[in-house]
């Protein structure tokens, strides 16, 4: 991958390469659980990090607001802050570029380069592959998503999206409502104009690559977002672990995005391959529980 210049970029390249077979698929949750865990292991084993992978509790930032939260206030201990404000940004319009009904989302209070906190001088090297911009614009790198294309990290923090789609009530509804994995992950990924808690986190972060379906791991906050996705799934699993964290009843879906092109149903015997992130290929059945297979963790 010519544009990958670091181990961090290896993870982005992996996500770009597999995007259409890890979203709206039967392996969506297990793939991202393993991916986030591998990132944590790389930080610990290759970078000397002594902590654990934290999660972003969207329910809390929906109360405090994103820019005043400890996570995004731009302090030295944050995940950096907002981007430089771009005034009078129009709404985002999702779906129209792929022939789907339009979903209108408000723009945030930033939009430009991040100028505070640990990632203020960070370079995003890969993409864009499918970057949603205000006004219904979608852009791609004409040289392809894997070409070297260094640019600043941009954010457009949007508390309104956080409060509408990823608040405490929507989290609770996603845990208590669905009684099977198909309904659970469908609700999480969004139905119609409801973008779900998964989309709610991504689009409340905004920016480049935060609004890029393929390149979103290029913002380090991605891993905190997916830590919370994994936590919500884990809580739901604990309500019926025999059914929800074990066997064929724990997964649902096919091997391709919205089954396009048509593909076989995902099996617990299917393999999750982390590609450039360099993890050992694992069977889905070994990734269903956080206390078996390669994993040994629980959530608070």
Which residue stretches match the model-derived regions?
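C-terminal accessory segments of proteins
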Residues: 1-300
């Amino acid at each position: 991958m010519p544009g990958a210049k670091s181990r961090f970029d290896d993870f982005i390249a992996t996500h770009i390469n597999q995007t259409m077979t890890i979203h709206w698929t039967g392996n969506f949750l297990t793939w991202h659980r393993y991916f986030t865990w591998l990132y944590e292991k790389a930080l610990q084993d290759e970078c000397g990090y002594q902590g654990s992978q934290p999660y972003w509790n969207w329910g809390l930032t929906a109360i405090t607001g994103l820019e005043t939260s400890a996570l995004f206030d731009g302090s030295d201990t944050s995940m950096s802050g907002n981007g430089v404000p771009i005034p009078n940004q129009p709404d985002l319009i999702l779906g129209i570029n792929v022939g789907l009904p339009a979903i209108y989302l408000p723009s945030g209070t930033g939009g430009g380069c991040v100028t505070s906190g640990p990632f203020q001088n960070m370079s995003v090297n890969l993409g864009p592959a499918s970057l949603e911009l205000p006004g219904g614009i979608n852009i791609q790198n004409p040289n392809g998503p894997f070409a070297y294309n260094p640019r600043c990290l941009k954010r457009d923090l949007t508390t309104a999206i956080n409060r509408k789609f990823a608040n405490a009530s929507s989290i609770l509804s996603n845990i208590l409502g669905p009684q099977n994995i198909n309904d659970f992950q469908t609700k999480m990924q969004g139905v119609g104009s409801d973008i779900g808690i998964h989309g709610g986190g991504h689009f409340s972060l905004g920016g480049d690559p935060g609004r890029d379906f393929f390149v979103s791991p290029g913002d380090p906050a991605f891993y905190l977002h997916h830590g919370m996705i994994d936590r919500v799934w884990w809580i739901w699993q604990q309500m019926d672990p025999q059914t929800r964290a074990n066997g064929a009843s724990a997964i649902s879906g096919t091997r391709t995005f919205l089954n396009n092109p048509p593909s076989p149903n995902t099996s617990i015997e299917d393999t999750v391959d982390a590609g450039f992130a360099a993890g050992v290929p694992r069977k889905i059945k070994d990734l269903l529980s956080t206390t078996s297979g390669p994993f040994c963790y629980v959530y608070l």
